[in-house]
Amino acid sequence: MNKIYLAIIALLALTSCANTYEIKGTSNVSTLDGRMLYLKILKDNNFKSIDSCDVLHGQFHFQGNLDSVKMGNIFMDDEPVLPLVLESGDITVKLDDAQQIVSSTPLNDKLFKKKKKYQQLQNQQRELVHKHDQAIMNGSDMNVVTQKLNAEAIQLSEQEDKLITNFVTENFDNVLGAGVFFLVTMGNQYPMLSPWIEDIMSKATDNFKNDPYVKD
């Protein structure tokens, strides 16, 4: 009887550990030190705080229990700092002036691998502005330059749309699909049906369509 009791206790302990997360963060951003960070999730169409901590000597820490995997976001006051997936395990967050990375758990690794590719495309788009300004300084034919840069901008925009569309559709049935869809469209003041959104919705599963990140 005692062996059975101990086995049950051990199983409950393992189950409890399997449904917990711990976020260990580091930052070299001087303006963050001494500030309060909030861990929030979307609930009833609003971000609700589920934990908070101070950044002390470039370190911060969150932990908690999970009933299911969720998308979360770290906020400073009312400003979102970065998204992440709340899933079981030890989650590592790194904030610095050059980049923001969440790693060490499967879905976070997947999310930030794709985020890195997205940022590379955005950097290339910003570089087009530099090329335009440099061409003016060099006295180049701006009609030719503008035509070339516009073509490059269209190509980069199409690559961005394809990157997002493929990532969302590949993750229809986990939190990444709806979560990334929400992050990309949350800045829209009104509902918009751009071609890439129409493409996603035409392929979407019921699970995706009924997710609060999409439905609301």
Which stretches of residues belong to each language-model region?
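Charged, long alpha-helical assembly modules
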Residues: 169-172, 176-216
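A non-transmembrane, solvent-exposed segment enriched in polar/low-complexity residues
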Residues: 17-165
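Intrinsically disordered, low-complexity regions
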Residues: 11, 63, 161, 165, ...
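Sec-dependent N-terminal signal peptides
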Residues: 4-14
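Hydrophobic alpha-helical membrane-interaction elements
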Residues: 13-16, 208
